[in-house]
Amino acid sequence: MVRKIAAAAVAALFVPVVQAAGWEKLWTFEHGAGTSVAGQTSEILAFDSLNNELWVAGLKGVDILNAATGSFVQHIDTTAFGELNSVAIRNGVAAFAIAAPIKTDAGSVLTFDTTSRSFQQSYLVGALPDMVTFTADGRIMTANEGEPLARPGFATVEARGSISIIDTTKDSVTTLGFSGYDGTTGLGRIVSPGAKPSIDWEPEYIALSKDGQFAMVTLQEANAVAKIDLMSQQIVSVTSLGLKDHSLPGNELDTTDRDITSPRTSIAGNYRNAPVFGMYMPDAIASYASGGKTYYITANEGDSRNLTDFVDGEFNEEVRVGSSSYVLDPTAFPDAAALKADSNLGRLTVTTSGGDLDGDGDYDQIHVFGGRSFSILDENGNQVFDSGNQLEALLFADPALRALIDDGRSDNKGVEPEGVTVLELGDRTLAFIGFERTFDSVIAIYDVTNPTAATFVDFIVDAESNAVEGLTAYEFGGRYFLATANEGTGTTSLFSITPVPEPETYAMLLAGLGLIGLAARRRRS
């Protein structure tokens, strides 16, 4: 069905809009049912261009799907090795990132031939490899999260976050840690009390520069990114992503989950500025080139640390503003009592590991998890663009889409942008940002060709799926595709992406000219 987003509603948001692509859903495959293995899920996926297949990583291993038809081809069981977290493919080789049964032990990377689907080699890497990718020259990289292990009755076992680089031609593994940053301050957030970067920082996701010289790694809980020199195989910098000022116009947010009228009725539209700061805390990261330079796109999901250990005690950095244990500084917040009301900021989930600027035990700033946005960073990790509150505000501005917003997450991290991938479509570069917390699967499409002025294109909405976890976009046979792994429904979906030769239009200009009928077209499954 072809439908139009009301231009007047979009124009009111002063959001640039460009129509550069159309989309159509081709198929959805349900894992764990029929020909698939019982209990299998869909979390991360990779495309094999040699065989036109999608390899989908889930709880039980990898399901291989025929990309042309969406039919099941084969299952590779990885449960004997540990927990499968990620899959990547390059030139007929698939790499699996697998956490050890005890997650603080060394993890492993397994490689397979994508044509014969036979096992090739195994490599030991750092603790809890959460993401795997290939470099331009064929090396394999893993982001090893190194989460601590907390179990009732046992002392907490610490692990070290790291990045591993595998040279398969030499069967060598180089693992990089953060001990060189233990004497530094201000580069990345420290969550656990008294911890050092070498223990506290947890690499999450990797993207590669377009010249193949560098990698950028998200350190989600630390609210930072690390830059890796792939030639010297060294960490060359760690850059804090700073804080998002939600008191500024364009950064409005919904702070309460108490304005729903029924389970599927969305927010009442109470987006507003508030005296809080968001920690961007990106999960996924992707890269692209513009003007001869590399830029990185981050999905600013947010994350917190919560450990339950009956020997060492419990650590949970989450608290609501309205909690009596969360004391606001009376000078910074003379209206603290009003702010703590549930109708104001009282329901908002914040961190206890930041905001006490003078160390006196009360909070001079309110820090929330995630940016509820995507950002574009330059080659050194400096922000050149942030989508502000567009991802949620654009959904709400469309009467046909606002019911997809789960108001029960407003007090947490909103729609939680988690996954991101990019696609070069002619002379344009499109970014696809997947939301984890909407009732149906929602993916925002932005034209990011100009990295300092990204423009909204469309929403992809899939009523058969929800909780988009992984995305990959690719070209095959002269056509363009987007594949999504939908964790909530255990499904994988494939969409065709089609260029639309339409000149750029800006919402502010539309409002000024009164062209309220002009809108971004979209198809909805």
Name each region found by the language model.
Residues I5-A8, A20, A519:
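Compositionally biased, intrinsically disordered low-complexity segments
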Residues E502-A520:
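A short, hydrophobic C-terminal helix/tail in secreted or cell-surface proteins
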Residues M1-A6, T505:
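Bacterial N-terminal signal peptides that target proteins for export
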Residues A21-T498:
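Beta-sheet-rich non-transmembrane sensory/scaffold domains
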Residues R522-S525:
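Short, charged juxtamembrane terminal tails flanking transmembrane helices
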Residues V15-V18:
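N-terminal signal peptide c-region/cleavage motif recognized by signal peptidases
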